Design a protein with these regions (language model features):
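Membrane-proximal intracellular helices of multi-pass ion channels
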Residues: 2-570
Length: 570
């Protein structure tokens, strides 16, 4: 690995992210606290057009139960509409290739995937999805489901700043503001840049070209740029093509690839800054952001080092390994940029890919898997990233309080037993679904038959799939043939349970916090804006994930690495 190139790449990446996250964070806080709508009355009137069908309930404050029910109801409606679109796409317009409707189990899995913002894709995207399904099914659900995660994060922040006021805002108002004033403007701007760089944006289904050898080739096209931008901006990852960002029409240049990496991390950084402004403690937000950055850099260096290492089985064949492990990677990106993309995708729960996770070296694949298993925490973005991070922050404050004998308070709110129970529920549910789902798959013929390689690599394929859907990531080891009734059903159940349980538990914490008095500057308070808190935040994230998943990782990537470097070359 070229260390200088890696360091310069990281410095440039974070310089751009921090430069952009401050103004975007200020803008986001103005959007969600209503300042922008008050300053520009026309924006309020536009919002009212979309909220008109709801009447007064579109503006009235909600407690946590009403807020939660509204978001769950939207998710249910999105799932039903998505299922109908995917199931009956053969009868809908914009289907020039006459694709039939998806099978019931696949349509169910896909609808749940995009309505919960997981965007797991167990199908060959451009070869089974009509343009209508891509543009009006996949893309629309991406906007709505991602907005659900953002508004839930701001509802959590309101719970921390309210004092004896159970209101968390209005879910419908927040959703409209998120889509209209946050995602749509950014998506339009970035889509124009993507088209300029070579991404396709058309309602033609394919383009016919004559190859150098002479035969005619049909290449799938469509409204790619608009979908590719929102999937990375909203940190969902559901691509137009099966190859995702490795496809030359999705990321035609290294510039587009780098922009996609920036967008994956930008929303998370902006959310943290906006959270700090809303709570009146920007330093606390930066403490969390610093912890996220440390974990990200460490993971990237491990993955980049692993992928710069030659595969010993390939070296034995006399193949030059000067470029590192190039299997499953695009030459236009190389190992370094692909490693950075994989780190950003796994850490931010974007689920995108610019190369094959299945072809990574065991350490690289294992670190990517661990980033997913940490739980949408490191630059978690618009899915459940911010409110999951705040859940970990509450755990860190609680542990610090126990260590020093102080009352655990976070931003002036006392942390009680109810808060800790709900945090435990939200943090443990994805782990439970991951491990139980993996165990069931390994014990059933349907689960085992889907793997492409026996032994530890096949186990990693299964573990990666259930880790991905339970933590709202959506990426996968491509060698797992997951488009069957068993995996479509099992993975959809995991996605649904984890989304509903974590969302409900963390909004319950927000409601409980909102009803408490806020006592700032208490002598019993623990500082949450310094290096000690950042260190504890990092330790909690690392230790919780390692304690939970190290045994499973030992059976997969760790054993595979030992076999690869020592087992065959002892």
């Amino acid at each position: 690995m070229n260390t200088t190139s890696a360091v310069l790449l990281l410095v440039g990446l974070f310089a751009v992210i921090f430069t952009l996250s401050v103004p975007i964070g200020i803008y986001m806080s103005a959007v969600f606290d209503g300042t922008l709508s008050q300053k520009f009355p026309w924006m309020y009137r536009v919002e009212s057009i979309f909220l008109w069908p709801l009447g007064k309930s579109g503006r009235e404050p909600m407690d946590w139960k009403e807020y939660c029910v509204s978001l769950i109801a939207l998710t249910v409606v999105g799932t039903v509409i998505g299922y109908l679109i995917f199931r009956f796409q053969g009868y809908l317009p914009y289907n020039p290739l006459n694709f039939k409707g998806l099978a019931p189990d696949l349509a169910f899995n896909t609808a749940v995937s995009f309505s919960t913002s997981t965007t797991w894709q167990g199908y060959d995207c451009e070869n089974v999805m009509s343009l209508f399904s891509q543009a009006f099914g996949v893309c629309t659900l991406t906007f709505l489901s991602s907005s659900t995660g953002v508004v839930a994060a701001f509802a959590f922040a309101r719970g921390l700043i309210q004092s004896r006021d159970p209101s968390l805002g209005n879910a419908w108002e927040d959703m409209v503001r998120c889509v209209l004033w946050l995602f749509l403007p950014l998506a339009v701007i970035c889509s124009i840049i993507a088209v300029w760089q070579g991404c396709t944006q058309t309602f033609d289904a394919m383009t016919v070209v004559k190859t150098i050898e002479g035969p005619i080739q049909k290449i799938a096209v469509g409204p790619v740029a608009s979908q590719e931008v929102i999937r990375v901006l909203a940190v969902t990852g559901g691509g137009f093509f099966s190859a995702n960002s490795a496809h030359p029409f999705a990321a035609p240049t290294a510039v587009v690839c780098m922009i996609q990496i920036i967008l994956m991390l930008l929303m998370a950084a902006s959310l943290v800054f906006a959270y700090g402004r809303m709570t009146g403690n920007v330093k606390s937000g930066f403490s969390i952001l610093f912890g996220m950055m440390v974990l990200f850099i460490g993971a990237f260096m491990l993955i980049a080092w692993s992928e710069s290492t030659a595969n010993p089985l390939v070296t034995e064949l006399g193949v030059s390994h000067g470029l590192g492990n190039m299997e499953g990677k695009e030459v236009r990106f190389g190992t370094l940029l692909t490693s950075l993309f994989a780190t950003g995708s796994s850490a931010s729960a974007a689920g995108s890919s610019a190369g094959s996770f299945d072809s990574m070296m065991p350490i690289g694949g294992g670190v990517s898997l661990w980033l997913i298993q940490v739980g949408d925490v490191i630059f978690g973005g618009s899915r459940s990233g911010l409110y999951t991070m705040l859940g970990l922050a509450i755990v860190a404050v609680f542990i610090l309080g126990m260590l020093v004998g102080k009352t655990p308070r976070y931003l002036g709110k006392r942390i009680d037993a109810y808060d800790m129970k709900m945090v435990c529920v939200s943090l443990l549910m994805p782990s439970i679904c991951t491990l139980i789902g993996t165990a069931i798959a390994c014990l059933t013929p349907q689960g085992v038959d889907a793997v492409s390689a026996p032994g530890p690599h096949g186990f990693t394929q299964i573990l990666f799939a259930f880790s991905s859907v339970s933590n709202f990531n959506g990426s996968s080891f491509g060698g797992l043939a997951a488009n069957d009734f068993f995996y479509n059903t099992a993975l959809a159940i995991c996605m649904w349970i984890c989304r509903m349980v974590t969302l409900t538990a963390l909004l319950a914490i927000a409601g409980n916090m909102a009803s408490k008095p806020r006592q700032m500057n208490s002598v019993q308070a623990i500082q949450t804006d310094g290096p000690v808190f950042s260190f504890m935040f990092i330790m909690v994230a690392v230790l919780l994930s390692m304690i939970t998943f190290f045994p499973a990782q030992s059976l997969g990537p760790i054993v595979e690495s030992i076999q690869l470097f020592w087992g065959y070359h002892s």
